[in-house]
């Protein structure tokens, strides 16, 4: 995506290009999914760290404030789904942190911006999640997931992400009904 910006003070125009990852165009990312306690599976791609985690799946419908959500201690240990379709476009702004670290266990978005644009930004969301060992999942229909959580209530879930032995065993279990039942019991 390319956007033209007009700087009022300098009376100049500059062009900024953004690389945006969408669910269907992420060849360089690893396979990932979320498995809900009710057995539903939403497949997508990995960003941030990779591995296998469990937690309570919740959602937030905020159009901005992803930095505040990630650093809010009230989300401690939860898998948070962000319904707004593009996350990360204004980067990381330490002044906006609610605390000194990320508190969510997992983070789910429709798409994320690799090259944020903000004069205050200090990095991108993918690098930040990796640095704090937080698993991210992108490329899924976050609104469909939110509808399930809204109608059924919050429920436990598991994110499976990457190519580790643990992740590959969990992906294999999803294809076998008896192994899937064992996997669901771990949630």
Task: State what each model feature region is.
Residues 27-187:
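RNA-binding accessory domains that recognize and position tRNA/RNA substrates
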């Amino acid at each position: 995506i390319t956007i033209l910006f007009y700087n009022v003070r300098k009376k100049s125009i500059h062009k900024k290009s953004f690389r945006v990852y969408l669910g269907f165009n992420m060849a360089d990312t690893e396979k990932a999914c979320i498995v809900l306690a009710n057995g539903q599976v939403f497949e997508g791609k990995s960003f941030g760290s990779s591995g296998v985690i469990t937690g309570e799946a919740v959602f937030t419908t905020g159009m901005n404030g992803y930095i505040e959500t990630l650093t809010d201690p009230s989300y401690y240990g939860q898998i948070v789904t962000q319904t707004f379709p593009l996350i990360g476009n204004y980067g990381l702004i330490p002044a906006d942190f609610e605390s000194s670290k990320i508190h969510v266990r997992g983070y789910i978005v429709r798409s994320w911006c690799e090259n944020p644009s903000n004069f205050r930004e200090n990095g991108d969301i993918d690098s930040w999640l990796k640095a704090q060992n937080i698993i991210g999942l992108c490329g899924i229909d976050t609104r469909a997931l939110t509808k399930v959580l809204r109608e059924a209530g919050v429920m436990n879930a598991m994110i499976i992400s990457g190519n580790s032995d643990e992740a590959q065993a969990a992906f294999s279990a999803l294809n076998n009904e008896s192994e899937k039942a064992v996997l669901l019991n771990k949630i």
